[in-house]
Every structure is written in structure tokens, then in C-alpha cells.
Amino acid sequence: MRRLALCLAVAVAALVAAPAALAAGGPVFAAQGGTGVASHVHPGIHYVTVSDGRGGTLLETLDVAHGAVFEGPALRGSWGIPTLGNGYTAGQGLSRDGRTLVLASPASPYSAPSRFLVGDPGRMRAARKVVLDGTFSFDALSPDASKMYLIQYASARNLSHYIVRVYDLRTNRLMPGKIADRSEDEKTMAGSPMTRTTSAGGRWVYTLYQKPSGEAFVHALDTVGAAAYCIDLPKNRALYNIALSLRDHGRTLALRWRSGRPWLNVAAGTWEISYPRARFPWTWVGAGIGAALALLAGGALLLRRRRSEELEQHSGNELGLA
């Protein structure tokens, strides 16, 4: 076990650099270092991959709560944690129960074939290797880790057009066809992932995308039912500053500015867009009333003081003291 200081320094540096490097979005890629992927079962536990300096990879466990790093198994080859978004989104690839971790080659999706490691974080030496012809990157896992969703790109030179595929981890087979919104006519999707959020049980994965034209849409992926829905959004040039969250027990997808100001809501299931009503500014009204009362009180005190001085002067004149 090593102390966490050095690793945290690297993680902080990665978080500082990430927003600048990823502000415009980009393909899902595999990253080493940083904060890795967080456990859903054990708060404060993160899995991070780092180079061993000899062409291999170390899988480390960060225990943020206790300030420690546990060095895990040494893996042959270079592997990273799947990562996407604008620098604010955590790593991907860990199942909801924490028993399955997906690692990807850092060369993906810029080269073919595409390589992935799938296994228990505690026994990654025994992980199975998935090798696919073509240009793929990781997208999501179903809650029971039976399905791995992948992004298949048109080519390594064209990462803005792609389709979503599903790989059956039980049969070790890439399933035919694509996972797409049946109401859409496009043969491929187009856009760069900006940020995402996942439902409490891990079934639904909502990803905010920006098209090459600048238009935005949310890709709602049902990882259990192997279905997808695309919700077109109003054009917004500042998508890098948008955060996603789920409300009303997962029934509402809220898109908010990182300042906390709401932008719009999407109703899960119907996919209807609505705009939050502006709340009455009671805080500002209260502050204004308070300031007005303070001014009135100050004015009354000043008037009383001046009145008292006038009375004293008048009394002095009456007594001939002036």
C-alpha cells in the first residue's frame, strides 16, 4: 500500500487539464491516471489504471476515504478506463454490483482491431479479452453485466458518425444489427458525447450529444431492453456547461447549467420537453424589503434626533439661554 498523496496530485492535474482538453466533447476513449471509475457499491473507492513503465498496466484501487492506494495486478499491454465527456463526467465501465470492469485499449477508437478486457476488478489477470475487427469504443453495461454496449465508428478517420452495437457477454458474441431509435431514418448517428447520467439501478443511460452542426440531442439507452431513443434539443452553443441529473425517482431528466440554473426537463418515457417555470424571487424581494425597512428605520432615527435637537434649542431660547 502506498500513500494517496502522489496519486491525488496526478488526479487533480488530470481534472484541471480535462475540461480544457475535452470541452468540445469527443469520442469515448480509454484513459490512464486521473480519478478512474467510482464504485457504486463502496463509496470512496475508485479503480484507476496506470502504466508500469514497461509496456504493461497496473490496476490500482484508490480508497479516498482512508487516503490509500492499493496496487493491483499487473496486466500485459496498455489498458485504460473508458472515459467520455467534457471533463466533469466520471469514468465508465464498472457494473452496478462492482463485479465486472471493462478496460479498453488506449489506441481505441483510433485503430483497428479494437480490444477490451472484461473481468472482476479483483481478478483482472483472469479477465477475458474481447477483440473485434473494426473501430469500436465502450459505451455502457447492463446492470447484470450480461450486455456490453459499444460504439462502432464509420472508420478511424470518421469518428463523428457511428452506430450503437451490443456484445453479449454470456455468449461472447457481437449481436447483429444496431441499437437505434426506430423513429429515426438515419443510417448512422452523428455527434460527440458531452456528459451523461445513469438511473439509480443502472438500466437507463442518458448521454448528451452535440452534432457537428452544433445541434444537441439526448441519447436514452435502455441497457436491459436493448433499445434507444433520441430526443432533439434546442441549439445551444454552451453544452460543455450543461449537467444532467434525474429527478422524481427517475421520471424526469433535468438539464441544468453548472451554476444550478435550470435549462429544460425531459419526461422519461414520453420524451416530452418542458421548461421549468421561473420561481418568484422571494429572496430578492425579502432582501429589498429588509433594505427598505432599514432605510426607514435609519430615516426615522435621524428625524427623531433632529427633532430632539430642535426642541432643545427652542427650550433654550424660551429660557433665554441661547
Placement of each model-derived feature along the sequence:
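A short beta-strand motif characteristic of beta-propeller blades
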Residues: G25-A30, A68-T83, R125-V131, R173-T188, ...
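Repeated scaffold domains used in trafficking and secretory/extracellular systems
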Residues: V28-V41, S78-G93, D133-P143, S183-T197, ...
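Short coil/turn segments that connect the beta-strands within blades of beta-propeller domains
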Residues: P43-I45, D97-R99, D144-S146, G201-R203, ...
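Residue position within the beta-strands of beta-propeller blades
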Residues: V48, L103, L150-I151, T207, ...
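Short glycine/acidic-enriched loop and turn motifs that connect beta-strands
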Residues: S51-G56, P106-S111, Y153-N158, Q210-G214, ...
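Short loop/turn segments that connect beta-strands within beta-propeller blades
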Residues: V64-G67, D120-M124, D168-N172, D222-A226, ...
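Selective detector of the "anchor" transmembrane alpha-helix that sits immediately C-terminal
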Residues: W282-L303
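Cytoplasmic C-terminal tails of single-pass
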Residues: R307-A322
